[in-house]
């Protein structure tokens, strides 16, 4: 997306075709097709970067164990338990669970996993098709601790360009970004388009980069913004 296309007039032109529609990972649908919808879920996610191992020997040994009934009480009290507790990475499990959701009347789900916590656009598309449930994908930037280092140097227009590109052109393949480091942005387009902005991270106090990360794109494109506050 060209920088000159980002701005109120450019955004309106590029996004005009989305007016009155819901954009899912498999395409546009009419709002009445959304039905019963969960608005903040994570079908595929990896929070490992936010939850480093503990710093004592006994805690590290416990941390390395798989999630089990024996460790259930610890898991409930300490969300940082174990590497296996940090990620949802099974398409098959997600399809199975969405099948149960559909069985009880669910029709749609909004997945708010972002690139810095390893969004998987193609995985979400596979899940949606296999389960027969509409999935709306988020875009934007999570809490500042997960931002690519270069984001501090980007202006609002550059950030807006990336967000609007996810909505209009399609999201990048995040495995490409992950393997080359978060400081490098690659636009290997998957063709899977975002339908909402978020979840935008809001630390306490709010970081300057978090503030500029969603304010500008919201105005011209009319997409809802979902936030996470800590």
Stretches with model-predicted labels:
Residues 2, 7-77:
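N-terminal basic, low-complexity leaders that serve as flexible interaction/assembly modules and, when applicable
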Residues 40, 109, 141:
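Divalent metal-coordination and catalytic microenvironments
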Residues 45-88, 139-160, 189-193:
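Active-site gating loops and adjacent loop-to-helix segments of metal-dependent hydrolytic enzymes
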Residues 114, 140, 230:
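Short, ordered loop/turn segments at secondary-structure junctions
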Residues 23-24, 29-32, 95-103, 107, ...:
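Histidine/acidic residue-rich metal-binding segments in metalloenzymes
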Residues 68-95, 113-116, 199-206:
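Divalent metal-binding segments
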């Amino acid at each position: 997306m060209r920088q000159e296309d980002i701005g109120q007039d450019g955004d309106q032109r590029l996004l005009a075709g989305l007016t009155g529609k819901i954009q899912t990972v498999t395409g546009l649908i009419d709002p009445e097709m959304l039905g019963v919808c969960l608005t903040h879920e994570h079908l595929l996610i990896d929070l490992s970067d936010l939850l480093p191992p503990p710093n004592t020997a006994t805690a590290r040994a416990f941390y390395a164990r798989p999630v089990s009934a024996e460790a259930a009480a610890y898991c409930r009290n300490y969300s940082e338990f174990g590497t296996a507790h940090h990620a949802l990475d099974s398409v098959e499990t997600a399809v199975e669970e969405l099948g149960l959701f559909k069985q009880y009347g669910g029709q749609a789900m909004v997945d708010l996993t972002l690139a810095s916590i390893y969004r998987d656009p193609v995985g979400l598309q596979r899940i949606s098709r296999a389960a027969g449930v509409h999935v709306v994908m988020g875009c934007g930037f999570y809490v500042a601790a997960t931002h690519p280092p270069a984001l501090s140097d980007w202006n609002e227009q550059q950030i807006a360009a990336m967000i609007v590109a996810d909505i209009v052109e399609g999201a990048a393949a995040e495995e490409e970004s992950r393997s080359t480091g978060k400081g490098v942005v690659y636009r290997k387009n998957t063709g899977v388009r975002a339908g909402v902005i978020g979840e935008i991270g809001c630390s306490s106090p709010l970081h300057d980069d978090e503030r500029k990360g969603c304010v500008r794109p919201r105005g011209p494109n009319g997409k809802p913004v979902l936030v996470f506050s800590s």
